[in-house]
Amino acid sequence: GLVSNSEYLEFVNDGGYQQSRHWLSMGWDWHNEHAVKHPLYWFYKDDQWFEFTLHGAAPLDLQAPLCHVSYFEANAYASWRGCRLPTEQELEIFLVAETVSRNAVGEGALHPYNSDYRHGQLWCWTQSQYSPYPGYRPYDGMLEEYNGKFMCNQFVLRGGCIATPDGHYRHSYRNFFQPQQRWMFSGIRLARDLS
């Protein structure tokens, strides 16, 4: 399943943001340049972790899925756990078998998950770079502008999020962001090789 806040907090408490060995070189530089010490919207006050949510600041829900992390953070966490991020193809196959639990913003959601969370409310980072599918030919007009020019230095996220319109949501829906971005509803799933 998705990495929980509790699981990620172990990484934070173990000095995951102070140890370069689990970070990609570019990620380590980004993290140091921007003084990143925890997921976006987390903060520590009066010996307790809090998180800014869509309904304001609240104590960090340790059982909830982790949200608002960059590719760099996701990759460092996976390395720390002795795992890796799934490929785009692995995650698509996995998501087809999962039950969709939608709770879209338009339906009054105040948080990107609920107690029976499966997928559909958080994007999940993959290790796959955003590149065209085999046989891809750019369309003329606006779609060419949207797809073709962005296939550089971006990583694929899968699964949809609470801000994904129902008409767009499907198991094969791809999103992509630069590896330092973490403002979107992004979470982590881990993968291991069978051998």
Give a label for each model feature.
Residues 96-97, 101, 191-195:
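Short amphipathic alpha-helical segments
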Residues 5-6, 12-36, 118-195:
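Surface-exposed recognition segments
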Residues 1-100:
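Active-site microenvironments of metalloenzymes and redox enzymes
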Residues 58, 106-108, 125:
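Catalytic DNA-binding helix-loop module of base-excision-repair DNA glycosylases/AP lyases
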Residues 84, 94, 109, 116-122, ...:
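Structural signature of nuclease core domains in nucleic-acid processing machines
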Residues 63, 99-119, 175:
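Short, well-ordered junction/capping motifs at the entry into regular secondary structure
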Residues 80, 114, 189-191:
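Residues within well-ordered beta-strands of beta-sheet-rich folds
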